[in-house]
Amino acid sequence: MSRKRSPTPSRISEGHPFPLGATWDGLGVNFALFSAHATKVELCLFDARGEKEIERIELPEYTDEIWHGYLPDAHPGQIYGYRVHGPYEPDAGHRFNPNKLLLDPYAKQLVGRLRWSEALFGYTIGSADADLSFDERDSAPFVPKSKVIDPAFTWAERPPVRVPWDRTVIYEAHLRGLSMRHPQVPEAVRGTFAGLMNADLLAHIRRLGVTSVELLPIHGFVDDKHLLENGMSNYWGYNSIAFFAPHPAYLASGQVNEFKEMVAHLHDAGLELILDVVYNHTAEGNELGPTLCMRGIDNASYYRLMPDQRRYYINDSGTGNTLDLSHPCVLQMVTDSLRYWATEMRVDGFRFDLATILGRHPDGFDERHGFLVACRQDPVLSKCKLIAEPWDCGPGGYQVGGFPPGWAEWNDRFRDCVRAYWRGDDGMLPELARRLTASGDLYDQRGRRPYASVNFVTAHDGFTLRDVVSYDHKHNEANGENNADGSDHNLSWNHGCEGPTDDPEIRALRLRQMRNLLSTLLLSQGTPMLVAGDEFSRTQQGNNNVYCQDNELGWIDWRLDDEGRSLLAFTQRLLALRQRYPILRRGRFLVGEYNEALGVKDVTWLAPGGEEMTEEHWHDEHARCLGVLLDGRAQPTGILRSGEDATLLLILNAYHDAVSFRLPEVAEGSGWTCLLDTQRPEDPLGERYPFASEFLVGGRSFLLFELQPPGAGAEG
């Protein structure tokens, strides 16, 4: 394709094709934009308010598919956008339209909000030719613009937090939802990065005992048109349009450095920051969506298109389009974005939404995909925590256990199994044993470690913990979709009444079941993830899909009742136990095999009679009580030597009635000390039970015992 070169204007010079984006060097700004199929790129400069286009300059050079130029008099604060010329041939995958002002994919800051208008679309709305038509209206008045920034920031000299995986406990939270109703956060900064710097809020997170805050998407995103028309918004933010820029509404100060200040506060509190990132699609939607950025820059390069009908998009994301990470420049954009957040912004890790897409070739998922390989070998990214949501909406999209070494994965099988077990479903013990021990059936391969299993019983997507035990069915009417949205696969149980109740027996059982679910989550092998608010029984009133509820339904209510305070204290105890006992977070998978050299098993599964579980026990569909003996003498590493951990016994009883459980035989003078009982959470603990005692395990309860050697004092 031939490209016309015009004389270089006096105020712009050739510049450089690298780095991509707008880069200030102290004297001017270098602009560089990838487009393999464009014929001309115009840089549009705007006034200080971002409202009036004051100049349009053609980028003078084209090197290795990068359009570039240098403005010696430009500086931070300059607001800009691009108009990209080229063929408008949707059937060939090209949708260039210079009437549409486009965001820089590498923009570090956004200015303004998107205002929905027919001018946003590259085609004429209502035309009989649909997206094959061509719209000539200027979209500039309706779109956010890019802004040049000065990245300078003075970081305190402190070592990185770098919490070891075996000590990691993830706290999944929505930035806005965390602080919007927090009474100690000043109203002016609620819902922003500055809000998360609040000392009282950080103190709560720190006292809770978690180590790593995982924020739902904070990249610049777009509110869907249909949501705005119905008085709602895209609260969760899984509709990204700018992978290098924080969402403007989250900047109380209007300055990007506010994000860095938040990171510094988290790190000062000893907390890691993990970002939930959405690199699988963009807010531009399908062929009938708006032209905001990549569609107008180089649609055929950025997106996966149907091979025989390039007018249409492959939709493995379920949102209308799918980014093509098999294209080297798209792969570069994503890895550049990750490195930017990890280095310039000092983020500690990433959770990848619909991560299967990031490893897709045309033939399906491949763990040797360029993106996954790049993350593993990159000197920056390989040191970050990398967490996959290991599924997408495409064929073969469910890849739990399929990611390569170096990755952790959301383990939805843990969630489903644990919920089903405590609900009282039959036949759950064999799978429960696997999930309690970090799902070795999924992850014990190629040197992967137990931390690869990110265990959760709730996530942002679905019921809260309280709602899991309070509702049989979702109640999403507030979303305006006739309760059709959100999953029906909830594995929940209302315990006799749908929703709130004053019945004291139901309330007590629900609270105990929440303690059971939390105990199973936080005392299992693997990496636990707790959702913000679950620690004190937050409810969403049965709505399991609050993606559009930027209001009190989606925000955390920090006003705690007695039940909330009780559950919070219990959760803090659980997390303290997890950190106190290394045997609850081992670096090796528990296999249950007898080690002849040491004379112990790392894990022994016990029936209520105290005997080791047999095949008959495992295949008893109605069995609902299980003991898990973790021997502290078991080999903790690859070196043949005895461990020096405590020996613990976990007993889980999902029967409605109490069960007599014979505690394991121990040496004379030793005994079992009860550390935790979800039926008696506030009773004095430390009661000691002697050799081979019979213990009455309450119905629907979880217990934790520690083996005390002869002469040892009871644990208080």
List where the protein language model places each region.
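Carbohydrate-interacting/catalytic domains
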Residues: 1-171, 176, 193, 205, ...
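Conserved, mostly hydrophobic/aromatic
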Residues: 33, 82, 173, 215, ...
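Structural recognition of the beta-strand scaffold that forms the well-ordered cores
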Residues: 169-172, 212-214, 242-244, 349-351, ...
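A generic secondary-structure signal for well-formed alpha-helical elements
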Residues: 78, 86-88, 177-182, 209-217, ...
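Substrate-binding/active-site clefts of carbohydrate-active enzymes
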Residues: 139, 174-347, 354-380, 397, ...
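Short, flexible loop/turn elements at secondary-structure junctions
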Residues: 35, 61-63, 73-75, 86, ...
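Conserved alpha/beta catalytic core and glycan-binding cleft of carbohydrate-active enzymes
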Residues: 361, 367-532, 537, 545-549, ...
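Core domains of carbohydrate- and sulfate-ester-processing enzymes
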Residues: 86-154, 225-233, 239, 269, ...
